[in-house]
Amino acid sequence: MGGFSFARCLILIVAASTLAVCTANKKWQSGSYQYPKYTQAPNKIIVGGSEGWHFNFSYTDWALKNGPFYLNDTLVFKYDPPTENTTIPHSVYLLPNLRSFVTCSLTGAEMLADVTQGGGQGFEFVLKKWKPHYFACGQHDGIHCSLGQMKFFVMPMLRGY
């Protein structure tokens, strides 16, 4: 019974991360934090805002600052298709669980969009289920995810509650 199991370590990491985010957010501490405007109709949200879906950007921070997200909201992933020597290819995967998210394992993950689907209007994903959704870039065997760059998760909330 001594020692920590993976689940206990994970709970400890999540709790410490939550505490760190809450204490670091000055607006939260001062009570001046304002939630995004609630609407009855589903929202269309561009992942990363004007930055889009690319390397060297914290999507976890973006999700924390732009949430909450609601059931039937649409996440739009915009990224440039790869070109010779100029654009690094990206894709979008839905990871099956928290363990896959933490370890950036693509085993059992579902490819939602390949390297060509983020151009133009982008690839759209509707949050249809009330469960955590774990997203990551799967290019180069998930190296973008492993570097902590292109991954985030959302837990959609129910509207009107």
Predicted regions and their residues:
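Beta-strand signatures of extracellular beta-sandwich domains
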Residues: S91-L94
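Short, conserved secondary-structure segments in the cores of folded domains
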Residues: L64-K65, F123
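Short alpha-helix capping/helix-loop boundary micro-motifs
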Residues: S58-L64
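Loop/turn positions that initiate beta-strands
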Residues: L71-N72
